[in-house]
Amino acid sequence: MVKVIDIGRVVVKVLGREAGRKAVVVDIVDENYVVITGPKQLTGVRRRRVNINHIEPTDKKIDIKRGASDEEVLKAVEAAGLVEYMREKVKPKFFGITSAEVK
């Protein structure tokens, strides 16, 4: 499967303190990094640069422009009817092992 990471794509963070939370890609820095935002008041993910290996794209996409502000992203999420979807947390899996199995 080809990873499709483009502006407006909803992604799930799979590593780090925000693992399992959803965010939206707002800018592509280079072939390894993108800028994402939750926005923070919606999902708890603040705007930051992340490695593409630390996120997993979903099939959802919203219509935003490159570098959109958190307010613009929030309005686009509301317009697409994805507010509850964005608030849901996903149990992160890394290499097929859940954190409960690591003990």
UniProtKB/Swiss-Prot annotation:
Presence of the UniProt keyword Nucleotide-binding in the record: no
GO molecular function ontology, one term from the record: RNA binding
Alphabetically ordered keywords of this record: Ribonucleoprotein, Ribosomal protein
UniProt keyword Protein transport present: no
Cellular component GO terms held in the UniProt record: cytosolic large ribosomal subunit
Entries under Gene3D superfamilies matching the protein: 2.30.30.30
InterPro entries assigned: Rib_uL2_dom2 (IPR014722), Ribosomal_eL14 (IPR039660), Ribosomal_eL14_arc (IPR023651), Ribosomal_eL14_KOW (IPR041985), Translation_prot_SH3-like_sf (IPR008991)
Entries under HAMAP family matching the protein: Ribosomal_eL14
Family annotation (PANTHER family): 60S RIBOSOMAL PROTEIN L14 (PTHR11127), LARGE RIBOSOMAL SUBUNIT PROTEIN EL14 (PTHR11127:SF2)
Recorded family membership: Belongs to the eukaryotic ribosomal protein eL14 family.
Name of protein: Large ribosomal subunit protein eL14
Source species taxonomy: Archaea, Thermoproteota, Thermoprotei, Thermoproteales, Thermoproteaceae
Gene from which the chain derives: rpl14e
